[in-house]
Amino acid sequence: MKIKWLGHSAFHVETAKAKILIDPFFTGNPAFRDGERRAVTAGLTHILLTHGHGDHVGDTVAIAKETGATVLANFDLCMWLGRQGVAKLEPGNTGGTIRLGSFSATFVNALHSSAQITEDGVSHSLGNANGLVLHFDDEPTLYHMGDTDIFSDMALVQELHEPEIGIVPIGDRFTMGGAVAALACQRYFKFATAIPCHYGSFPIIDQTPETFVAGMDGASTLVATPEVGGIVNA
């Protein structure tokens, strides 16, 4: 498995049988490198969304139309995407598992909101915010937490799914910060590898993973902090 960080919470996950984008926020993402777009959309099979905020839905509509990739998201967000012309949708909701060829995706809780704001400034709810647990046939289990704070039922995510790779938001203000994210990883999970995200993009969130890395000192988990465009092999 190759996991490429694309800035903010966007990732490209490549296995022998699937090419997946998670939360593909490219346009307007200060951290995204424009030259990456063609490489990470070539042969794309799936787009997975954790929630409906613009910095996570990102370029989903355009990419789905360009590539024909299947989009998985919560039910309300899928209904909205359908109205935008996205044809191949896999709607679900918290607790549900959907089989997608060589892997399955399970919607788990996240403590966050999920909405789009229209031109009149009104915020319209787009279902629950979620984390996503991906179980692959021949690869490590991956848990993208989405945007969230720490919560005690993370213990159940570990018990039920035993994720080996954690993608963890650490930027503070809109998600948990680095110290709390490290506490979540150490108290509730047995990750072999943790990859921090949701930092270093907008100036009002944390710019580096230093606090998270310091909080993980002494843990058995490998903390991987790739540069934007860098790859973690798992």
Swiss-Prot record:
It comes from the Bacteria. SUPFAM superfamilies: Metallo-hydrolase/oxidoreductase (SSF56281). Pfam families: Lactamase_B_2. Gene3D superfamilies: Ribonuclease Z/Hydroxyacylglutathione hydrolase-like. SMART domains: Lactamase_B. Signal peptide: none annotated. Keywords: Hydrolase. GO terms for molecular function: hydrolase activity. Belongs to the UPF0173 family. HAMAP family: UPF0173 (MF_00457). This is UPF0173 metal-dependent hydrolase Smed_0942.
